[in-house]
Design a protein with these regions (language model features):
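Active-site and adjacent substrate-binding regions of carbohydrate-active enzymes
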Residues: 1-178
Length: 178
């Protein structure tokens, strides 16, 4: 990664990494720690239904465990601490320029917990402490405007906003050619 960073800088290219702050794999060390020590260090990182002995998951996918941003410890390891998942890579020797944030529209939200704006404002603040020019691109399946007001994310990838007009255009073009 360091060699890639050096090569990209030499070519005046931006280096963006991808992270999934919304959920983690069932095989992630945090999940394994929780399963071994139910009251351990990572217990509060997840939504866990004790009555049914199951994790809350992303869109019902059993292998994708939803992260619980009510946990201040989770926020520390994800973006607050200097060596957090977000900040570590924004600093030397990696010095990445940007993050693509997977499932940005659902991060921090689960049932009555609607923490997305709070999480993105905080994450932006801490990311910019490590790299004042850090660029944050959120993945959205619909309109991301609510998070693009200057204090959360810098831009969004909007699948429907791109795909729907493209499909309509292609379909229209195809009909005219035939």
């Amino acid at each position: 990664l360091i060699a890639l960073r050096e090569a990209s800088q030499a070519r005046n290219m931006t280096l963006m990494l991808d992270i999934t702050p919304n959920h983690c794999s069932y095989n992630h060390p945090w999940v394994k720690d929780f399963e071994t020590h139910i009251d351990g260090n990572t217990a509060e990182f997840f939504y866990y239904d004790e009555a049914n002995d199951v994790f809350e998951t992303w869109l019902g996918v059993p292998s994708l465990i939803k992260l619980n941003y009510q946990s201040q410890k989770l926020r520390d390891v994800m973006y607050r601490s200097v060596d957090s998942a977000i900040r570590k890579w924004l600093q030397p020797p990696y010095n990445i320029d940007a993050w693509r944030l997977d499932v940005a529209n659902m991060t921090g939200n689960q049932a009555s917990d609607q923490l997305d704006h709070e999480v993105w404002r905080e994450l932006r603040h801490y990311a910019r402490e490590s790299n004042p020019d850090a660029y944050l691109l959120g993945e959205y399946f619909q309109d991301g405007t609510a998070h693009l007001q200057g204090d959360e994310l810098d831009a969004s990838m909007n699948y429907q906003g791109f795909n729907v007009p493209l499909r309509r255009w292609l379909t229209s073009e195809a009909k005219q050619v035939i």
